Design a protein with these regions (language model features):
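Extracellular loop and loop/strand-boundary signature of outer-membrane beta-barrel proteins
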Residues: 55-60, 112-119, 166-171, 194-196
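Solvent-exposed, glycine/polar-rich loop segments of beta-barrel outer-membrane systems
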Residues: 45-57, 105-110, 160-170
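Short sequence motifs at beta-strands and strand-loop junctions characteristic
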Residues: 60-68, 119-126, 171-178, 189, ...
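Short glycine/proline- and aromatic-enriched beta-strand/turn motifs that initiate or cap beta-hairpins
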Residues: 20-76, 144, 206, 210-214
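Cleavable N-terminal export/targeting peptides
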Residues: 1-28
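Solvent-exposed loop/turn segments connecting transmembrane beta-strands
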Residues: 139, 196-210
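Gram-negative (and chloroplast) outer-membrane scaffold detector with strong preference
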Residues: 30, 35-39, 68-160, 187-189, ...
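Glycine-rich phosphate-binding "P-loop"
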Residues: 148-179
Length: 215
């Protein structure tokens, strides 16, 4: 009987020790690689064609960049519950379509149909410093709340064979600052590799998901 209680006691201590382990602790490095959805510009602004009033027979409309954004995050645990790091993400949005317009021919003195193509791209890069507070931790789960702030750059370009438009590009964001508030969870499949999901406002997509590694 004494041996049975001894075995039960050792088992209880072992389980308690396992549950007390945390997936991250002071001194750990954490790397996240993620995709984000939605790409707000493509989902809302460019999802439906809005051609110029002079453009008729719009066709072959497609989005540039798709509906996802992509990014990476690096974090260093300065304490068991606090981490500091950098969050960088990138997205491309825009549209491409063919259209027909009527132009006056000075030789024939008649209006004639002309076919053109227009291609618009907006490339957005954000680089933000970040602070995370890890409020739930066990042997496999790491839940956190985060705040990030930093720099945003936007590059816009228009390419067309329509002589009534000028090809060109515009560099710089109207407000070159980006902020993000988020809550997220990492679930570790092994001691070092897991998956992550984050819900946030500003500074990227509403929902981010991907892989996480800690060292």
């Amino acid at each position: 009987m004494k041996k049975i209680f001894t075995i039960i006691g050792i088992s209880f201590l072992s389980v308690s020790s396992l549950q007390a382990q945390t997936p991250v602790e002071q001194g750990n490095f954490i790397i996240d690689v993620y995709a984000g959805i939605p790409n707000w510009a493509n989902s809302i602004l460019y999802n439906n064609v809005e051609p110029d009033a002079t453009q008729t027979d719009v066709r072959n409309y497609k989005l540039n960049g798709g509906l996802l954004s992509y990014g990476g995050r690096f974090e260093y645990m300065i304490a068991d519950n606090f981490g500091v790091g950098v969050d960088v993400n990138y997205e491309v949005s825009g549209f491409n379509y063919d259209y027909t317009t009527q132009e006056y021919n000075d030789v024939t003195m008649q209006f004639e149909n002309r076919d053109y193509n227009i291609d618009y791209k907006s490339k957005k890069l954000r680089a933000m410093a970040r602070l995370n507070y890890h409020f739930v931790q066990n042997d496999r789960l790491d839940a956190y709340a985060g705040f990030a702030g930093g720099y945003k750059n936007v590059n816009r370009s228009i390419a067309t064979n329509d002589t009534n438009y000028d090809d060109g590009s515009i560099n710089g964001a109207l407000i070159p600052v980006s902020f993000r508030i988020a809550v997220g969870t990492r679930i570790y499949f092994t001691n070092n590799i897991g998956g992550m999901i984050e819900l946030g406002a500003g500074g990227g997509a509403l929902l981010q998901f991907g892989l996480s590694a800690k060292f």
